[in-house]
Amino acid sequence: MLGDTALKLVHDSRRTAALDLLPAYQEELVRGVCREIRQLDASINKTQDEPGYDPQDRVAHCNLLVQHLAMRRDKRCLLAYQFTRARRMNEAAWKQTEEPNLNGNEQEYMKAYEDLIVDIKGPYTDIDLTGSLEPPNDVFIDVRVLQSVGEVQTEYGVFNLEKDSQFFVRRSDVQTLLLQGYLKEI
């Protein structure tokens, strides 16, 4: 039935929103949707090129309208799937996290986007453009160490960050470690 493959892509996009990691690219589904779009386009062109085609014929007009709307719906579903993946890759690039399930084209896109971020951040070395846009609620926070880091020198002294230990520290002192996943805010 028309649109079933595209609907699977939409379901995959919704499922992706709830996952921590981006799932593998659904290449077969994408190819299926593209194939369906080409078939619908060919069918529309064939109908319009027939010698007995009458644009005033309501049945033919309705048939063309349904095929055209199905083609547009497939395109929207495909674009929504691609946009969801691109948005997640952009977020990963800004957060400097790794996405392991990217295909070749997505890896190229991610690399180019990361290079663009480096170019943007280049002249502003004193400003952390990857930081959150929302101001912190508290200057000091409780953190739990997820991975042993060792000794960390801060403005207020030295912390020995061993796994499963907890500290009450300034957010600015441990922000990088939070982003890297060594610490978790409690």
Curated annotation (Swiss-Prot):
Localisation per UniProt entry: Nucleus
CC annotations in GO: GINS complex
Main subcellular location of this protein, as a coarse class: nucleus
UniProt keyword annotation of Nucleus present: yes
Pfam families: PSF1_C, Sld5
Gene Ontology biological process terms in this record: DNA strand elongation involved in mitotic DNA replication; mitotic DNA replication initiation
Classification via Gene3D superfamilies: 1.20.58.1030
Regions annotated as coiled coil: none
Family: Belongs to the GINS1/PSF1 family.
Its biological purpose: The GINS complex plays an essential role in the initiation of DNA replication.
UniProt name for this protein: DNA replication complex GINS protein PSF1
Organism: Yarrowia lipolytica (strain CLIB 122 / E 150)
